[in-house]
């Protein structure tokens, strides 16, 4: 089968951290809670303490889910970029190793979505 090419394709990424005015993107996926069908994307300051991210960014973002009020973050299991992760709540996102376009996964044992449906 013949393939016709339109030539070399070059692109300049537009989502590099330098284009975010000192901020960075952070993705977060709450496992077994498919009411949120994909990871949530947040624009955050690298110097924001992890505890502040939870209180001021994450909790308001997931507030609509019935399980959100039941989360015990001290029992949460975390992954950062597919690796086990134990956050230092007092340290900044940057000091926790969370950089531009990092993926956090949140697992809340015992909370399995609306009526256990994983949604």
Curated annotation (Swiss-Prot):
Disruption phenotype: Cells lacking this gene cannot grow on phenol. Requires DmpM for efficient turnover. The activity of DmpLNO oxygenase is inhibited by dithiothreitol (DTT) by a mechanism apparently involving H(2)O(2) generation. Its EC number is 1.14.13.244. It catalyses: phenol + NADH + O2 + H(+) = catechol + NAD(+) + H2O. GO terms for biological process: phenol-containing compound catabolic process. Keywords: Aromatic hydrocarbons catabolism, Monooxygenase, NAD, Oxidoreductase, Plasmid. One of its GO terms (molecular function) is phenol 2-monooxygenase activity. It comes from the Bacteria. The keyword Oxidoreductase applies. The keyword rRNA processing does not apply. Pathway: Aromatic compound metabolism; phenol degradation. The multicomponent enzyme phenol hydroxylase is formed by DmpL (P1 component), DmpM (P2 component), DmpN (P3 component), DmpO (P4 component) and DmpP (P5 component). The oxygenase component is a dimer composed of three subunits, DmpL, DmpN and DmpO (DmpLNO). Part of a multicomponent enzyme which catalyzes the degradation of phenol and some of its methylated derivatives. DmpL, DmpN and DmpO form the oxygenase component of the complex. Required for growth on phenol and for in vitro phenol hydroxylase activity. This is Phenol 2-monooxygenase, oxygenase component DmpO. The lineage of its organism: Bacteria, Pseudomonadati, Pseudomonadota.
């Amino acid at each position: 089968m013949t393939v016709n090419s339109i030539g070399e394709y070059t692109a300049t990424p537009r989502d590099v951290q330098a284009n975010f005015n000192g901020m960075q993107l952070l993705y977060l996926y709450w496992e077994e809670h498919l009411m949120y069908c994909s990871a949530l994307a947040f624009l955050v300051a690298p110097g924001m303490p992890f505890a502040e991210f939870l209180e001021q960014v994450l909790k308001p973002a997931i507030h609509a889910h019935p399980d959100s009020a039941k989360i015990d973050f001290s029992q949460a299991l975390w992954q950062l970029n597919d690796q086990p992760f134990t956050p230092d709540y007092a340290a900044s996102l940057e000091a926790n190793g969370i950089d531009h376009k990092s993926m956090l996964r949140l697992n809340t044992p015992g909370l399995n979505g609306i009526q256990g449906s994983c949604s």
